[in-house]
Amino acid sequence: MMSLLAVLCVLYVWSPAMLTGGLGSTLDSLPRKTVPIGSNGGRLFREEGIWNYTTMLLRDDLNLLILGAREAIFALDLDDITIKKAMLKWEVTRDQQNDCSNKGKDATNDCKNYIRILHKKNDGRMYVCGTKAFNPTCGYLSYADGKLTLEILQEDTKGKCPFDPFQRYTSAMVDGAYYSATSMNFRGSEPVMMRSTEESIRTEFTSTWLSEPNFIHMAHIPEGQSNPDGDDDKIYLFFSETAVEYESYTKVDVSRVARVCKGDLGGQRTLQKKWTSFLKARLDCQVPNTNLPLLVQDVFHLCPDDWTTCVFYAVFTPQSDSSQYSAVCSYKIEDIKTVFSKGKFKAPFNVETSFVKWVMYSGELPDPRPGACIDNHAREKGITKSLELPDKTLQFVKDKPLMDQAVTAEQPLLVKRGAAFTRIVVTTATALNGTSHQVMFIGTKSGSVLKAVNYNGEMVIMEEIQLFDPSEPIKILRLSSSKKQLYVGSEVGVVQLSISECGRYQTCLDCVLARDPHCGWDLDTEHCATINSIHRTRSSTVIQSLNDGDASQCPAIGVSKPVNISFYHGNTVKLGCQPYSNLAQVKWQFNGEPIKPSNTIQILSDGLMIFNASLDATGYYTCSSIETVSQRKYQTQHVAYDVKMWSESGTTASLHHVKEKERTLVAMVVILSLVLAALLIWNLYKGHLSLPCLHRRVKATQNRHEDDANQVQPQRLASSVVNFNSNNNHANDQRYSSSRETDRLSTTAGSTGQMSLKYIDDESEI
């Protein structure tokens, strides 16, 4: 029952309803620009047959990048890593590989020598360690005369380098002393944080101190410098582990930050050769939609000035598949210091015979305070080193190293759904107006790097740069402030990038709306330039707006010249359009009207598809985008197309032209009809034509007179054959036998006045 309550307690603390406040627009941020592999502008180094480029040491004094891989060490030019200065093979022997394989490890992958440790020593040499087929080995590496040389050390390397090449570890070299956090045995079941010196010192082998940890990062903070309390320097350790305070049937992992004092020598009787200053606290990065604590994956510390300004930036990922959110949180050194120096402790409390519950310790603390370094207060009591600490203080630290209060961030700097974050580095950029901004470079599990910055609580991801195939996670990031270069390692190679690629921003709008503190639009040269001291002296000719993204000063952009596109009937036509920003809303228009998707038209992220194109698809297309920044809308026309269809004659035609021809033909028909009507009226008016009704009256009168004529001369008419049908002037083949009869007939017809009308009527039929 108590176990169930413990789990419910964890879920309550991390319930989304408790964590949604204050995040605003940072939840699920989207990169403004996506840069594909072929356009990333980086330099790639890889060697045939070599893998696992995951250990780096920047040697600015030698202008070298020392790169550790699987069974090889490289010295690369720091300005151009494609230039290989030297290479050293450090391979396992056949016997070492067989011995490793006989212990149950995979001969192909596990039983190799993975370079895991690279640190510069005070004398200029480098301390290097490799897994050496599950038999860690260390040595001194030197570079001289264009060659790398290795001196193998015959020393006990347990706890200095991991046995397992795929186990998380961390290390640091501080004033010649080597600090490490890894496992001490072949099985990886003895985790330890230790300092390897003549006075070697380490953690206790107990789950109260370390419970199945994954070590992440180690950092030296010189808190002893100008410290009014006379405090000592600290070594901070970031890791994740199984939470002892949430003991249950289901394991719950949490993130931790621990610290020890640099001058710690261990105890005299209690905690002999063990840390007397080891304290740890839960590290929280609270994100909505997550039911369990996120786990820390990498940490980078940045100190703009002295140690009091140091900030730790950490990336977190979910510990289950129920959430796809990764986050970045930051922690001030003063906040961490306060938890350890003034916070309350947790103590184990036996609830049942098989269950221990950790609760806040409310009793009296020993003096000096457990876990404190030797400071002015301890010196006042006559204690000058940890060997002189009382057993009561040491026993408290041994039993209760866990703080009750967690180290928390105000709110995540960045939350993003999708590929998990893996690594982070941070640099400071000075803007055009002289203000400083912390720019983060975040590696992902999908082989890309995010460039992001926070403006007054608003997180802006300027770009996502794809460096490797999506199946290759980013495994290491290193930043050279002097070279302004980023070095990114993976299983398959290393890429060198400039921290500012302002040339990617093609227009003033694109440059200013990117809100990149490294970049500004130069009105004199009309291109996006890297901000430097020269620009700051003539800031009136450079446009940069980081907090507001105000691009109103940008010159107006003219309408783009249309691109002519022709197609055959039934083709599929694609009209490309790639907006500058993923945050912009794309707007397609056809002959000035918005386009809606249909069975024949599909709007894609990079263009417009027209299926089974016909004459109806011809016309004028435009692609524009509207980007909203700080409630301001900026519209850009990216491309225009004049689309025509090939006709059977081999010429192009558009629906617009066809309709113009149709309208012209209709107009000509109307005009011709009007002309014909006018001619008809004119002929009627002149009497050249008669109406049908008049023709019927004339014909009736003619027939009446013909009857009268037949009554006067019946015999003569009977002996004559005359055709008076309407076509008698054209189809009458009979002739009169004598002109006398013709003359008489003409005279008779003329006396009645009907014959000439008959002839007029016949003409009208023509």
Curated annotation (Swiss-Prot):
Glycosylation sites: 52, 433, 564, 612
Topology feature Cytoplasmic, residues: 686-766
Membrane protein topology class: Single-pass type I membrane protein
Start and end residues of each Sema domain: 27-499
Residues that span the membrane, as ranges: 665-685
Single biological process term from Gene Ontology: positive regulation of cell migration
A GO MF label: neuropilin binding
Ig-like C2-type domain ranges (all copies): 555-640
Compartment list: Membrane
Protein family according to the UniProt entry: Belongs to the semaphorin family.
Protein name: Semaphorin-4E
Gene from which this protein is expressed: sema4e
